[in-house]
């Protein structure tokens, strides 16, 4: 079975495909998650060895600091899965909502995208439509920011923090930074700061293939 772009669709559940790809990789791969952690939790349930086979597990999820009690969409959508994944032994690198939200795209970026190739023009049109329908001047780039942790820390800086996972808020998975040594806390490489101008330039230069005009 093929999709509209000519790519072959794999009929297996996502968890089975991920397990096979990781186990067959010649070098430890980076596993990236930019949505609810349901599939990753299923992978770890079916094949606990995967936690030790990946170079890192990069996740966009969680919220620290002000507003943390509200939680964050990706973890809240499947709190049980989030508990399994964040409590695992996988080498997690976490890009949190409170840091990744600082990088945005807005109307100026729409025009730059539309001035590039057909694919970028399409992206610019979609961004413009989203901003108009949401009635907002800009939108945060949560996922692209978090995914830079898979490459380097040129844009998003992280530190190993002590994180509590078992905050009792029904229907949510809330994480909290706690003092070192608190029982039940886990150590996790977590985002703490972002270089917004550098990330924005990197994203737009990469997508359009050209540096910003002066």
Where are these regions (language model features)?
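Generic signal for short, ordered secondary-structure residues
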Residues: 1, 64-65, 126, 182
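Short glycine/proline- and acidic residue-enriched helix-loop micro-motifs
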Residues: 1-6, 130-134
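Conformational coupling and interaction surfaces
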Residues: 76-80, 88, 95-214
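Active-site histidine-anchored catalytic micro-motif
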Residues: 2-102, 107
